[in-house]
Amino acid sequence: ISSDMKEKLALFCDVDKSAVIENLTAPTIYEVPLMMAKEGLDKIVLEKLHMDYSPANMEEWEKMVFKIKHPAKKVKVAVVGKYVDLPDAYMSVTEALHHAGIANDTDVKIAWVNSEAIEAADVELSEVFAGCKGILVPGGFGDRGVEGKIRAVQYARENAIPFLGLCLGMQC
């Protein structure tokens, strides 16, 4: 943001010019704290709160962001459930897989598999799980899709594919 634009924003938003910061679109949400620190947001907030300021050590965070943007490895994991058309239903599972990937310098790609779609015996599971290095069956409720989950568990067991079952997924 140009200095003139900052002055205009400060004037019409009733804030100090120094408190007008640029908020760019980030490739990953984890880069936002680094961008805000670069703009001096931490110092601005602490000054407004009349608190002492000392620069934060963001070295570990920077390393994490680098791993996210430049992973050394890639892996595909199948998530088998009945709500895969609404991936937000499995948000905690998705985030856990991505965080595990970050910790292991790996980009985790998720293959969403509808458990109801694989219930029939004529569905070729080797095609469904092609390239998957792990199968995860999350929790769920009711009987719908359970047979597909059981087939996924059996396929993982018989083909030595790492498997993680959560809640109902472990009971299958």
Task: Tell me what each language-model feature is.
Residues I1-C172:
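N-terminal beta1-alpha1 cap of cysteine-dependent amidohydrolase-like domains
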